[in-house]
Amino acid sequence: MSRKQLALFEPTLVVQALKEAVKKLNPQAQWRNPVMFIVWIGSLLTTCISIAMASGAMPGNALFSAAISGWLWVTVLFANFAEALAEGRSKAQANSLKGVKKTAFARKLREPKYGAAADKVPADQLRKGDIVLVEAGDIIPCDGEVIEGGASVDESAITGESAPVIRESGGDFASVTGGTRILSDWLVIECSVNPGETFLDRMIAMVEGAQRRKTPNEIALTILLIALTIVFLLATATLWPFSAWGGNAVSVTVLVALLVCLIPTTIGGLLSAIGVAGMSRMLGTNVIATSGRAVEAAGDVDVLLLDKTGTITLGNRQASEFIPAQGVEEKTLADAAQLASLADETPEGRSIVILAKQRFNLRERDVQSLHATFVPFTAQSRMSGINIDNRMIRKGSVDAIRRHIEANGGHFPADVDQKVDQVARQGATPLVVVEGSRVLGVIALKDIVKGGIKERFAQLRQMGIKTVMITGDNRLTAAAIAAEAGVDDFLAEATPEAKLALIRQYQAEGRLVAMTGDGTNDAPALAQADVAVAMNSGTQAAKEAGNMVDLDSNPTKLIEVVHIGKQMLMTRGSLTTFSIANDVAKYFAIIPAAFAATYPQLNALNIMRLHSPDSAILSAVIFNALIIVFLIPLALKGVSYKPLTASAMLRRNLWIYGLGGLLVPFIGIKVIDLLLTVCGLV
C-alpha cells in the first residue's frame, strides 16, 4: 500500500490526543467506560476532600490527599489519551480518504445510452438509478455499474495501486467506485447508491466512527471487568468499618486509592484503544472492515475457504507437456496445438505457442498470412481453435471435445481417456486437441503452487484452523493440487450453490467460516460466511454482501486478515491477564500501609520494605497511572503474534503477561518509592 504509514506517536496526533483526553473528562464520555468512571468518581471525591482539608473543614494531610487526587486524575487522562490516540490514528487515515472526495459535476444522461442528451448536475445530487457519462480525464462521480462502454480506470486514490484497471459493461468487472479517475475511453454508469452511501463514504465512516459498536467479546470482557470492580468496591467499602472497629479508621482518600489500584484499570483504560487499533491495523493492510465485530470474528475463525486460483496457485496455468494419442507423433500434436492457439491471447494460449516453439522449433506464424478463420472460446462451446486449408482444429476441455467428436460421428479414444486421468492425477489440467474427428492428444496445463504456501497451511493447522480449497477443476486435479499444497480438504467442480451448502454445513457444526469472493455469484456465500472478504475489483453485489473489502483485490490476504483478528484477541487477553496479575503487588503495597497502624501484624506483608505508609500508597497509585502509558504502544501495535496451538499460546501468555504482571509492579512500585524518598516528597 502506498499510503503513508503513521508513526506510533506522530507529534500532531499526540497533541490532538491530549486535547481530546481533556475533553473526554466530561461525565457523559466517562460513563461509557464503567471501570474508568469509578476512577473518575474517586478523583472527584478525593479532590473535594483535599480542598476541605486545605480549608480546615476536615482534618488530615491535605498535601498527601492532593497528590493522590492529582494522580487519579492523571490515570483518567492517560486512559482517555490511549483511546483518543487510537481514534486519532483512525481519523488521520479517514482524512487521507476524504482527500479523495472531490466536489465535481456530473453529466447526467436523460436516456441510458451513449450520445443521449445530458444535464450538468453536482455529483452530490446524484441518486440511485441515475445514469451518468464519464470520459477520459473525468472523476467517476458515484459508485455504480457500467452499463455501456469500457475504459481504463486509475483507482490508486482508493487502493494505493498505481497500475490502471479495466472496467467494462457485463461480467465481474462492471463495478466502479466514486472518486476514481477515467484514463481513457468512456463509460455509461448507473449509480447504485444515494449521496452519503458510497463506498468511499462508508470507508470514511468505518475508520473514523468514534461511536463504534462494541464487539461481543468486548462486551463480555466489559461485564467481567464490571463484576470485578463491584467485588473490589464492596470489599473496600467493608474495610472502613473494619478499621474503625479496630480503633484507627482508614481515611477515605486511602480507601479510594486502594479501590483504584485493585480494580482492573489497566485493561479498562486500554480496552477501547485495542478495539480501535485492531480496525486501524486492518486498514493498514488495505482491508476495510465494516465493524470491529468482523475483525473479532476473524480471530475466532477455524475454517478457511480458499480459492485455488490466485490464492493457492499462481493463477497462470502454463503448458508443460504435449502427450500424443496412440499413433500420433508429438510434433504433429504440438503443431496443431500451436495453430489452434495463435489467436488465443490468454496466458494458457500463449504458453502453448511458446512450448511448441521451445520443444520443436515451431516458429510462431504470421496470423494475417494464414488466411485462416479463428474460432474464439465461448462459455457454451468451451472450445477454441482455427479453420485453415480444410483443416478444422479445436482445443478444449475433455467433455467439450468429447461432445464435439460424438456430434460429428466420431469416437473418443480410450487411450486418451487414460492420458487425461494421468494428467489430472498429477495436478495439471488436461486440454484435448482434435483435428476433424481425430483426437491428436492432450496438453498438460500446470498450475504452479505458490512457494511457501504449504508451510503457511501447516501453521494454520497447528492453530486449529482447517483449510479448504475451492476450485472448478475436476476431482482428480483438485485432489492432486490439494495434496501438493497441503490443504486439509477441497471442494471440486465448485458452484455457488455448493459453496453456500459447504459454509452452512460447517456452521451447523459450530465452526466459524471465512472466505473471499469477487463475483455476483459469490454474494450468497459471502453473505452467509462469518468473515467475508470481498475484492474491491469485484461486483457491487459482492462488496455489499461481504463484511470486509480488500482494496488490493488479493485473495491471499484472507490469511493475513485471520492473523490480525487473532492478534487483536491475543492483545486483549494478554493485557487483561497483565492487569489482573498487577493487583497482587498493589495488594502487598497498600494493605500493610493502610492497616498496619491498626493491625501491626500486617507489617509482615510489606515484603517490598517501602519507606512509609504514605509513600507506599502514593507509589502504588503513580505506578497504576504510568503503566497505562507504557502499555499504549502494545495496545496499538498488538502483541507479538506467533502461530501456535491454543494450549501453547495460553502457556506463553501466562508466562509473559501473567508472570510479568506479577513482577513488574513489585519492581516499579519499589523504584517509585525510592525516588519519592530520595526527592523528599513523602
UniProtKB/Swiss-Prot annotation:
Mg(2+) binds at D518, D522. One of its GO terms (molecular function) is magnesium ion binding. Its main location: membrane. Keywords: ATP-binding, Cell inner membrane, Cell membrane, Ion transport, Magnesium, Membrane, Metal-binding, Nucleotide-binding, Phosphoprotein, Potassium, Potassium transport, Translocase, Transmembrane, Transmembrane helix, Transport. ATP binds at D344, E348, F377, T378, A379, Q380, S381, R382, M383, S384, K395. It is an enzyme of class 7 (translocase). The active site is at D307. Gene3D superfamilies: Calcium-transporting ATPase, cytoplasmic domain N (3.40.1110.10), Calcium-transporting ATPase, cytoplasmic transduction domain A (2.70.150.10), HAD superfamily/HAD-like (3.40.50.1000). It is a multi-pass membrane protein. The chain crosses the membrane at residues 34-54, 62-82, 219-239, 254-274, 588-608, 616-636, 656-676. It catalyses: K(+)(out) + ATP + H2O = K(+)(in) + ADP + phosphate + H(+). Its EC number is 7.2.2.6. SUPFAM superfamilies: Calcium ATPase, transduction domain A (SSF81653), Calcium ATPase, transmembrane domain M (SSF81665), HAD-like (SSF56784), Metal cation-transporting ATPase, ATP-binding domain N (SSF81660). It holds the Pfam family E1-E2_ATPase. It comes from the Bacteria. GO terms for cellular component: plasma membrane. It is found in: Cell inner membrane. The system is composed of three essential subunits: KdpA, KdpB and KdpC. Belongs to the cation transport ATPase (P-type) (TC 3.A.3) family. Type IA subfamily. Part of the high-affinity ATP-driven potassium transport (or Kdp) system, which catalyzes the hydrolysis of ATP coupled with the electrogenic transport of potassium into the cytoplasm. This subunit is responsible for energy coupling to the transport system and for the release of the potassium ions to the cytoplasm. NCBIfam families: ATPase_P-type, kdpB. This is Potassium-transporting ATPase ATP-binding subunit. It comes from Escherichia fergusonii (strain ATCC 35469 / DSM 13698 / CCUG 18766 / IAM 14443 / JCM 21226 / LMG 7866 / NBRC 102419 / NCTC 12128 / CDC 0568-73). The gene is kdpB.
